[in-house]
Amino acid sequence: MLRHIVLVGMMGAGKTTVGLWLSKAKSIPFYDLDQLIEGKERATIPEIFASKGVEYFREQEREIVKQVAYSSPGIVATGGGTLLNPSNLWLLKRYGRLFYLQASLDLLWTRLKNKTDRPLLLGKEPKVILEKLLKEREVLYKQADIEIAVDGRTVEELGELLWSYWETMEKTDPR
């Protein structure tokens, strides 16, 4: 394995869940950017947002992306907003293959509506906020090498499909 498998998409799309499953199934290192930031900061994402702000979080995210990009190839679960920074997108594309886990607004809402650990959704109309974020970010997610529809698929199905795409890409375009 020469490049990272980079999972991109909205919060709630299943990046961490699919990444962990694939990591275990294929014995490949797993990097969860949000978890790495939380470990570095010794605080949860909502705590970081509340105490230090979004800009500070994005700076920490940028540093973690650099570290992971240069690490041993593995599976990388990005945060929903990781690609908002052009340098993150560039680094991740340079050192990995990007897979967009595309989930419908309805599926995302079903998964997220009762969560309290999503600071960007803490407002009067969280579903409206979620829809707005999806529309704003989708153009970035679509810069991925492959788009995989999540709705109606199990974690195992998604992992195997992703791995199949990965193997084909590595054989036909090793970069």
UniProtKB/Swiss-Prot annotation:
Binding site for substrate: D34, R58, G80, R137
Pathway(s) it belongs to: Metabolic intermediate biosynthesis; chorismate biosynthesis; chorismate from D-erythrose 4-phosphate and phosphoenolpyruvate: step 5/7
EC number: 2.7.1.71
Entry GO terms, CC: cytosol
Entry annotated with the keyword Transferase: yes
Cofactor(s) needed by this chain: Mg(2+)
Gene3D superfamilies according to UniProt: P-loop containing nucleotide triphosphate hydrolases
Binding-site list for Mg(2+): T16
Pfam families found in the cross-reference section: SKI
Molecular-function annotations in GO: ATP binding; magnesium ion binding; shikimate kinase activity
Family, similarity comment: Belongs to the shikimate kinase family.
Name of the protein: Shikimate kinase
The species this protein was found in: Methylacidiphilum infernorum (isolate V4)
